[in-house]
From Swiss-Prot:
The keyword Methyltransferase applies. The keyword Methyltransferase applies. Belongs to the class I-like SAM-binding methyltransferase superfamily. TrmB family. Substrate binds at K182, D214, T252, R253, Y254, E255. This is tRNA (guanine-N(7)-)-methyltransferase. InterPro entries: SAM-dependent_MTases_sf, tRNA_(Gua-N-7)_MeTrfase_Trmb, tRNA_methyltr_TrmB_bact. CDD domains: AdoMet_MTases. It is an enzyme of class 2 (transferase). GO terms for molecular function: tRNA (guanine(46)-N7)-methyltransferase activity. GO terms for cellular component: tRNA methyltransferase complex.
Length: 276
């Protein structure tokens, strides 16, 4: 989800300055995952880092709840990167094997907390890069009693690439991602052909990719990208190609902003099909 505007900080530290994390619970690291001498080329990301100012409640959440809900992953060149060779040990993290849902960009955690609490039979992992949003999400997970949810502070595409294997995911959610309106910024859109191929590889056959946006041009961009992926097929799509609103998805402040501004909310639901 899109964060509220905040003053921009320098986007990332250099590889020499980058903070490196030790692997957290449930993270397997293969040989070569921390090769500090390697030259790393940073790719295009779908976000701009902002200053991590937190209020008292958010700071308290980071101090008291991070050890419960935040998965610390090995880093590569930046504080939101993921080291190649890392892999989540999901049974170790959750203490069981259960269907897994991943959310890209949890924002303030409204969707993650509500649906994790509503579905204790499933496990949930949310990606987010903004520290205040993560802290707010930790509070909401705790208040909801969502012990089956975790958060990772990382670029979601790197996380999908390095932390999960083929067919690990039952569902993936991308709700109200930054639309990056300017044409020269379209390469930053999280929904793009490369991400679609990656998501398809991580979804099990029959798994779902649920998306929503309040911007018409991004909605049609998503539709074009997903339609070009041969292993994804639309679910309950109308003549315009869009799906009905998923009734379980809570109305967040991001969706409310779009509705208040008079924009149409577009939902897309696509299923990963078997290769044949």
């Amino acid at each position: 989800m899109r964060p509220d505007p905040a003053p921009l900080d320098p986007t990332d530290a250099s590889p020499a300055q980058a903070r490196r994390h030790q692997p957290g619970l449930g993270v397997e690291v293969s040989a070569g995952a921390h090769r500090s001498g390697d030259r790393v080329r940073r790719g295009v990301v779908s976000f701009v880092r902002r200053s991590p100012r937190m209020n008292v409640s958010q700071q308290r959440a980071m101090n008291t709840l991070a050890s419960t809900y935040l998965i610390d992953v090995p880093r590569d060149a930046t504080s939101t990167s993921v080291a190649p060779g890392s892999r989540l040990d999901l049974p170790a993290i959750f203490g069981r094997t259960a269907p897994l849902t991943v959310e890209i960009g949890v924002g303030s955690g409204d969707v993650l907390a509500a649906l994790a609490a509503a579905h204790p039979e499933r496990d949930f992992i949310g990606f987010e890069v903004y520290l205040p949003s993560i802290a707010t999400t930790l509070n909401k997970l705790e208040n909801a009693g969502a012990s089956n949810a975790r958060v990772i502070m990382a670029d979601a595409t790197a996380g999908l690439d390095h932390l999960f294997g083929p067919a690990d995911l039952d569902e993936l959610w991308t709700f109200f991602a930054d639309p990056w309106h300017k044409k020269r910024h379209h390469k930053r859109r999280i929904v793009n052909p490369d991400t679609a191929r990656l998501v398809t590889s991580r979804l099990r056959p029959g798994g779902l990719w649920r998306l929503a946006t309040d911007w018409d041009d991004y909605a049609h961009w998503m539709l074009e990208v997903l339609s070009a992926e041969p292993l994804l097929k639309p679910v309950d799509a109308g003549p315009d190609g869009f799906s009905p609103r998923w009734p379980e998805r809570p109305v967040t402040r991001y969706e409310n902003k779009g509705l208040t501004a008079g924009r149409t909310i577009h939902d897309l639901t696509w299923r990963r099909v078997d290769e044949s």
